A protein has these predicted regions:
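Low-complexity, Ser/Thr/Pro/Gly-enriched N-terminal "stalk/linker" regions
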Residues: 1-27, 140
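Contiguous, well-ordered alpha-helical segments that form the cores/surfaces of helical PPI scaffolds
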Residues: 33-45, 63-67, 101-109, 165-170, ...
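Glycine- and acidic
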Residues: 20-27, 47-49, 195-197
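Membrane-entry segments of alpha-helical transmembrane domains in multi-pass membrane proteins
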Residues: 25-32, 93
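Glycine-rich, acidic and aromatic/proline-enriched surface loops and short helix-turn segments
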Residues: 1-9, 67-74, 172-176
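Extended ligand-binding clefts on enzyme/binding-domain cores
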Residues: 83, 87-100, 106, 116-230
Length: 230
């Protein structure tokens, strides 16, 4: 119902970042790569669950696909925020590594759920996403992002396995040739939890532990699986 109301089929296929109900301010006129990716995932999931028919799913995916091809990008990577009315990046223009990783994962899902012609257009977006430009080869880690206003890479890095950035790491190795040794560089500090062991994240949030499971579930008795339950 949320997407039926706030992403109408007659629009540009971009979901709002949020909707404020009290006090009522309506839908935010901005969106991000993660918002777009989760909307694509929701369309495919709704079709799988029988909430919408295949025709509506295809129509929604095509609408978003058309807009994605038209958005200004940095080496094929979306900026972190766009005005949903003008389709221009919001300033300061910044490219977020983790958000681009989330979008790439969702594009792969949308591609697999689409007919051949649409799948090819999704693939062209995937091929253009130069995630390797956000990778620090010396550290073997992804930078937080890239400041397009200053034309400068971020100085901080994603360096923990228990992080939402795990999606970025996985799809970048699979699709963009990032070396597998990058996975070994991700830190695995542990805490004792109820007689077992759980990975530390930066802030202990459900977002960090659970979001990667949308794309890459882990077996129950692995360190990642135990950490998510702990």
């Amino acid at each position: 119902k949320y997407f039926e109301r706030f992403v109408p089929l007659s629009g540009n296929g971009l979901p709002p970042d949020n909707v404020q109900l009290d006090p009522c301010a309506g839908a935010a006129e901005r969106t991000s790569p993660t918002n777009i990716g989760m909307y694509l995932m929701s369309c495919v999931s709704a079709r799988e669950l029988g909430l919408i028919d295949p025709g509506e799913m295809r129509a929604r995916l095509r609408e978003t696909l058309r807009t994605l091809h038209s958005l200004p990008k940095w080496h094929g990577l979306l900026y972190n925020w766009y005005d949903t009315r003008t389709l221009y990046p919001l300033r300061p223009a910044y490219v977020s590594s983790v958000d681009c990783g989330n979008l790439l994962a969702a594009l792969l899902v949308a591609r697999s759920a689409s007919p051949e012609e649409d799948a090819g257009r999704f693939q062209s977006l995937i091929d253009e996403m130069e995630l390797e430009r956000l990778y620090d080869e010396e550290r073997g880690l992804f930078r937080i992002g890239y400041d397009a206003e200053k034309d400068a890479p971020g100085q901080s890095h994603y360096d923990l396995l228990a992080s939402e950035a795990r999606i970025l790491s996985y799809v970048a190795m699979a699709e963009r040739g990032i070396p597998v040794r990058h996975w070994e560089k991700l830190g695995r500090p542990c805490a004792r939890v109820r007689g077992g062991c759980a990975l530390y994240s930066w802030s202990g949030t459900m977002f960090e532990y659970m979001m990667p499971f949308l794309f890459m579930p882990s077996a129950t008795k692995t360190l990642l699986g135990v950490s998510a339950r702990g």
